[in-house]
């Protein structure tokens, strides 16, 4: 898993509440268990006007040249609701997103994001409203996210966000569940030598 310490990128505003995982990555594309290749299907039903995904919907924001290289997604409340498919996070990461800023996330989506180096940031509705106003006034605006200091830098302003210290540590060191287990493998093996034989059966 890649490390997340600091990132500066273009903000892509998705001004919609309750964006569910079927919108993020429709079910017909969930045929792989590898994490690559889902980016081209991100927001498929919004990005394309045909079922084959060959004709772009020019009204959708990711098809705007200003935003096509965006890496920070700005959203409303309950982002990532719906089914628990981790493919939704894979699609966002594969497209190039590094962080999502929203009023709230579904619990499972939030957890899946942390396990894939996608930083989910929650801010108050009032702050999210301000950020949307800034983005609309300054299309293609860059902002910076600093995980070390828990700060978002937007032009001359800065906003603080909260994150669990354990999740922060894992993101900054690029550790997923497997990495964490391997980190303590020697202790696990030592503990297993202490288990009585009758408990091993």
From Swiss-Prot:
GO cellular component labels: 3-isopropylmalate dehydratase complex
Pathway participation: Amino-acid biosynthesis; L-leucine biosynthesis; L-leucine from 3-methyl-2-oxobutanoate: step 2/4
GO biological process: L-leucine biosynthetic process
Reactions catalysed, as given in the entry: (2R,3S)-3-isopropylmalate = (2S)-2-isopropylmalate
UniProt-listed PANTHER family: 3-ISOPROPYLMALATE DEHYDRATASE SMALL SUBUNIT, 3-ISOPROPYLMALATE DEHYDRATASE SMALL SUBUNIT 2-RELATED-RELATED
Job of this protein: Catalyzes the isomerization between 2-isopropylmalate and 3-isopropylmalate, via the formation of 2-isopropylmaleate.
Descriptive protein name: 3-isopropylmalate dehydratase small subunit
Gene name of this polypeptide: leuD
